[in-house]
Amino acid sequence: MNTLYTLFATCPRGLETVLSQELESLGCTDVQVFDGGVSCRGGLEQVYAANLHSRTASRILLRLTKGTYRNERDIYKLAKNINWFNWFTLQQTFKVKVEAKRANVKSIQFVGLTVKDAVCDAFRDIYDARPSVDKAAPDVRIHAFLNERNVEIFIDTSGEALFKRGYRLDTGEAPLRENLAAGLLLSAGYDGTQPFQDPFCGSGTIAIEAAWIAARRAPGMMRRFGFEKLQNFDKTLWSDLRRRAEAQTRPVRAPIAGSDNDRRIVQTALDNARRAGVDDIVSFSVADAQSVRPNGENGIMVSNPPYGVRLEEVRALQALYPQLGTWLKKHYAGWLAAMFTGDREMPKFMCLSPKRKIPLYNGNIDCRLFLIDMVEGSNR
């Protein structure tokens, strides 16, 4: 019998709609968008497929229970009533993380200890022993979410966060997480059939994610997952899903290029591309952005140009933006330029009018993805 679970997939804020489309395409049902994630229903196949195939999710959480509470004692009872031994063994380690929004509790840390005690006591009642906690590298991660009246307890099927694809060991000074980079590409309409460029490529994350989209490469192929350590792990199903994922890859026809004016960071991008298995697909070079020229017609540029945090940085960059606008208008007619930035004034200083402004967060930084159709001459 195929048990259906209630799932919650977390993602960078602003990518919830893109993630919901991914989950629907993987066969999830009852898909609902919330701030910071998407809830849905699915069986083990959808759990495994979401971890393997979602480009934008951060974690796939599986709900074990939901209830109301008045105090920490209610949370303890709810957590202790879960059949934890159906999910992991006494010999495995675990960790509890609690998140709350307007919760009626004295301390989030105390709720974490309460859930931890409930798990340990549930095991102790059966085995007269308790599993150990490992905060650094647990076998099993448990998440509790509280609001004013309700508590939900989940088991994390992902393990390490899904943006950890396995190819990026070295990071640039301001690395863009892989799932956010993929989300920028999908939000811009990139599907791998158009020429692609990133003239501010940094450590290459956007270009590498573009190559994986173009090759139909599942982003989870290089890593392990939390669900592989759970008691209900179906090895046959997982092997079949991986085999199908390998069979769906395709040759990349359209060119993909990244460039940066920092030789050291371009070397990092080359190393990352090699580990990602796309060094024969992505062309990286050392170049000042304004010396770069299109690698085809009607392409897509997705880039995270430098933007300032301190006032003097902002002023220096805002002097550069008009030059970038002139360069784009002169050389990139027919292209879509998707600029991701924390500087909402960027298009104005570039003298360009975006057709769409998509609010997104890079960590805690409130950013915008500006989609600009490039036409010859002035675009204002």
Curated annotation (Swiss-Prot):
**Which cell locations does it reside in?**
Cytoplasm
Q: Name one GO molecular function term.
A: 23S rRNA (guanine(2445)-N(2))-methyltransferase activity
Asked whether the keyword Methyltransferase is assigned, the reply is yes
Catalytic activity as recorded in UniProt: guanosine(2445) in 23S rRNA + S-adenosyl-L-methionine = N(2)-methylguanosine(2445) in 23S rRNA + S-adenosyl-L-homocysteine + H(+)
Principal localization? cytoplasm
The residue ranges crossing the membrane are none
User: What Enzyme Commission number(s) apply to this enzyme?
Assistant: 2.1.1.173
Q: Which CDD domains match?
A: THUMP_AdoMetMT (cd11715)
Gene3D superfamilies recorded:
3.30.2130.30, Vaccinia Virus protein VP39
Query: Is the keyword Glycoprotein assigned to this protein?
Result: no
Q: Which domain of life is it from?
A: Bacteria
> InterPro entries, per this entry?
DNA_methylase_N6_adenine_CS, RlmKL-like_Mtase, RlmKL-like_Mtase_CS, RlmL_1st, SAM-dependent_MTases_sf, THUMP_dom
Tell me which UniProt keywords the record has, alphabetically: Cytoplasm, Methyltransferase, RNA-binding, rRNA processing, S-adenosyl-L-methionine, Transferase
Physiological role = Specifically methylates the guanine in position 2445 (m2G2445) of 23S rRNA.
Q: What is this protein called?
A: Ribosomal RNA large subunit methyltransferase L
Q: Which organism is it from?
A: Neisseria meningitidis serogroup B (strain ATCC BAA-335 / MC58)
